[in-house]
Amino acid sequence: MIKVTFLAEQKVKEYSGRVTGFDILQPDALREAIAFKVNGELYDLSREIESDTEIEVIQLSDEAGLDIIRHDAAHIMAQAVKELFPNTQITIGPTIQDGFYYDFATDRTFTTDDLAAIEKKMKEIIKSNHRFVREVWTRKQAIDFFSDIGERYKVDIVSSIPENENLTVYKQGNFVDLCRGPHSPSTGRVKAFKLMKVAGAYWRGDSKGPMLQRIYGTAWRNKDELNTYLKRLEEAEKRDHRKIAKDMDLFHIQEEAVGQIFWHEQGYTLYNVLESYIRKKLMNNGYFEVKTPILVSKELWEKSGHWDKFRENMFIIDESESKKLAIKPMNCPCHVQIFNSHIRSYRDLPIRMAEFGTCHRNESSGSLHGLMRVRGFTQDDAHIFCMEKQVNSETVKFCDLLKEVYSELGFNEISVKFSDRPDTRSGNDEVWDRAERALLEAVKEAGLSYELNPGEGAFYGPKLEFILKDAIGRNWQCGTLQVDFILPERLGAFYIGTDGHKHHPVMLHRAILGTFERFIGILIENYAGKFPVWLAPTQLAILTITNESDGYATEISNVLKEQGVRIKTDLTNEKISYKIRLHSSSKVPILWIIGKNEVTNKTVSVRNLGSEKQESFSLENATELLLKIINLN
C-alpha cells in the first residue's frame, strides 16, 4: 500500500500500488492542475508515485505553474523551428523572468517574418494538444539517439553527464528533447504567448565557442495577462534610462571605456545629490565613513577567499612575476583591515563602517547594459562588526533605515527574500539556527513580508535581499544584508570580550542602493526623468522673454544660488516657446518665466513640468514655495 498525504486538505489516502497524479486527483482538480510536488520535488502529473509521500497540487495560478507553462512554450518553439527549418540544430531552452528562450545553431539569420511563421507553427502545435511524455534513458541511449538525428549539441550535453547516470527526455508528437522537466500534461495548456526578439549567444557562454541565435519569448496564463505585460514593456521602453539620459544630458558610455560611465554635469549633480542624501542618513544612524585603496595585493584576496572564488571577475595587474595586484571588486576585506588597526573591546561594538567604495568587476561585454550592468561602480557599502547577540537589533535598525530611504526616494512596496543555509556551508548548525532566527525576527519586527529562498544563503551565513517595486510594476533587487561568521576569522579580526578573551565579531555586509549607477538607472526609469524637486539635478530654470529682463533674472538667480537652489538661467535670444520646450525636454521640474510685466511688478510666472498652466506669484511667495518644496526631504 502507498500512503499519500494531501497537504492542502490535510487528508491521507491509501492506494494498492503505484499511482500517478491523474489517478489520485479529482476531475475538477485535474482541470486546473499543471503538475504536483511529491515530497517537495516537482513531478509531471503522469509520473508514478512509488512510496509513501506528501503531495501538493501545482496550478496555473501558482508561480511554479506559470514557470512550467513557459518551459512548455520553449519546447513548443523548438519543435516549430525544427519543422520549419529542419537543418537547424537545437541546444538549450530554459525559462527566465517573464518568459523563456531557446538557442539555435543555424546558418540562417532569423528575421521578423521568421518569428511570425514560428508563432503560427507554435499555435498549430498547441492546437494539436500533443501529450508531454516523459521517458528515462541511459546515457548511451541518449547519445545514440541524438547522434543518429544529427543533434551534436545535444550529444555534447549528454556526453558531459556521468556514464552511470540516467537522464530524462520529453516527447511531444514527433519531437524529442533532452529535459529534466517537469511539463504540463499537454501542449494545449499554453494559452497566451508571444515571441519577442532574436539575439546572439555563445555556446555554453564561451566567447571562443560557436555563435548561436537566441529567440526570446514570453508566455502568460491568459491573453489579458499577456497584453498587460506587453503594455508594460512599451512603457518601459519609453522610460529607458539610456534614452532619457540623452535628453537630460546625464551621462554617456563609449568603446574606449566599455562598461564605465562618463558622468556629465547634470548626471554627476544627480549622483552627488543622492550620495549626500545617503551620507546624511548614515551619519544620523551611527555610521562613520572610511576610504580604502582601489588596488590591493592578491595576498589579501587569497586570505579572504575571494581569489579562489572571484578571480575570473577581477582586473589583475602583474607588478612583477612574484607580486600581483587586483583592482578591488568589493570593499569588505579592506574594511576588516581598518577594524584590525586597533584593539577592539566588546564595549566598542557595534562598529558601523561605511564607504562609498569604487569597485570594478570584469563582467562580460554581452551582459553590460547602460547603468544597470557596468564594470566600474560605486557601492553604498557598509559593514557592521558586532557580537552575535547584536545581530537581531542591528538588522532591525537596518531594515528601518532601508524602509525610510526607499520611501523617501519614492518606493513604498518592498518585499524580502530570506535565503537560509546551503548544503555546503561553514559553521555549526547551532550558530546557523541563531543567525537565521535573528534575521527572521528582525524582518517581522520591521513589518516586512518575506519569501523563503531555501538553501540560497552564502556559505558564510544567511542573507536578506530587499526588492522594491517601481512605478510600472517591475521588481528590482537592490538592498542586501548578509551575516558573515567566516571573513572576520579568516582575516584575524577579534575583540576582547567580557571574559577578557579574544572573540571573532560577526560581520554584517549591508547595502541599501546596491550600486549608485544601477540605482540611478532605476530612479530615472521609475520617474521617467521627472524627479521630485529635491532630487532633480536642475531644480529651477529662469527663462527671460527679452533681454530687458536679464538684470532681474540674474539678480534672482544669484540670491537663490546662495540658498542652495540648483538653478539655470537662460538669457539667450531664443523665443520663449523654444526655451520652454528645451527645458521641459530636459525635465526641469519648475520654470520661472520673466518678461517686462514681471520686472515691473517684481513677480514671476511659474510653470510646472507637464503643465501648460502658468501662474503669477510675487517673488517673495514664489521663493517661499520653492524652498518649501525643495526642503520636503
Curated annotation (Swiss-Prot):
- Which regions form coiled coils? none
Q: Which cofactor does it need?
A: Zn(2+)
Enzyme Commission number(s) from the entry: 6.1.1.3
Where is the signal peptide, in residue numbers?
none
Q: Which UniProt keywords apply?
A: Aminoacyl-tRNA synthetase, ATP-binding, Cytoplasm, Ligase, Metal-binding, Nucleotide-binding, Protein biosynthesis, RNA-binding, tRNA-binding, Zinc
Cofactor annotation remark: Binds 1 zinc ion per subunit.
Q: List where in the cell it is found.
A: Cytoplasm
What does the entry list as the binding residues for Zn(2+)? Answer: 332, 383, 509
Check the record and name the Pfam families matching this protein: HGTP_anticodon, tRNA-synt_2b, tRNA_SAD
Q: Which domain of life is it from?
A: Bacteria
Which family does the record claim for this protein? Belongs to the class-II aminoacyl-tRNA synthetase family.
| Descriptive protein name | Threonine--tRNA ligase
What species is this protein from?
Wolbachia pipientis subsp. Culex pipiens (strain wPip)
| Organism lineage | Bacteria, Pseudomonadati, Pseudomonadota, Alphaproteobacteria, Rickettsiales
Gene that encodes the chain: thrS
